[in-house]
Amino acid sequence: YVFVANETGVEMFDSGVWTWDHVDHFHFYRADARKIGAVPGSGVAEISGGLLSTAGSTGVFFPGTGDAVLLDNAALADGDIEETLRIDTGARNGLIVPLGAGALVTEASTGSRADQLRVIAADGAKGDQISCEEPAGSITTRVGVVVGCADGAVLAVENDDGGIALEKITYPAGAAAPATTFSARKGRPTVAGLGSDAGTWLLDTREQAWRWIPSETPLLEAASVDNEAGHVVTVGVDGVVRVYEATT
């Protein structure tokens, strides 16, 4: 899907191209592109997706009101817009990330700036929470859901018993600026993160560890594309595509 956010809501388009993840291989599909519709809201929304486009949910956070919305992906695939969850977070910054049948949602413990994350069940029931100052950026890996914070990242993992474990993966001492966006080949356990400094973070969600890869040129985009060699494909402000290999 393509989500076009502006000050009055989010317009949604079905690209007609999608994949289905079978862990060791992918199935690729194509259909006619079409406009699905729009969800009205206040402020340019933050969009968070999962691993699949035709199952699970997509999260939409409206900063103007603090509303956090989950959209059903199966309904979007049929050309319909169906909200499965809508809550008022009380924050004017943040996100809502699909997590199982529910979501991981930012909250403000005081004031209107988000400073923590909370597990919300499909029926809206509140679960555990964990601190997360200045939340920004999210991605779903095979291990769990990642949300960036000022001091690291929160990793939310579904347990075998259906519970959710929340862990903070802190940056090393003297670290570069925090990552505010994350990108990787779909489902990879290691993801690349970009912040304001020249270089890219690598977050290994299996080992729960960060690695910093500096670059001479500031980067516009960075994506982790494999696990074993730690390859990261980047695009610099000079328009040059570079591939980095992480080293210990």
PLM region spans:
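A charged, solvent-exposed segment within the mature domains of Sec-exported extracytoplasmic proteins
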Residues: 55-110, 123
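Loop/turn residues immediately N-terminal
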Residues: 7-11, 65-69, 102, 110, ...
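Loop/turn-rich, solvent-exposed surfaces of beta-rich toroidal or solenoidal domains
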Residues: 220-248
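Repeated scaffold domains used in trafficking and secretory/extracellular systems
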Residues: 1, 7, 30-56, 85-101, ...
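Acidic, serine/threonine- and glycine-rich low-complexity intrinsically disordered segments
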Residues: 107-227
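Acidic/His-rich segments in extracytoplasmic proteins that coordinate ligands and/or metal ions
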Residues: 5-49, 56-61, 65-76
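Structural core positions within WD40/WD-like beta-propeller blades
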Residues: 3, 59-61, 103-105, 146, ...
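Short loop/turn segments immediately following beta-strands, especially the blade-tip
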Residues: 13-25, 71-78, 157-163, 205-207, ...
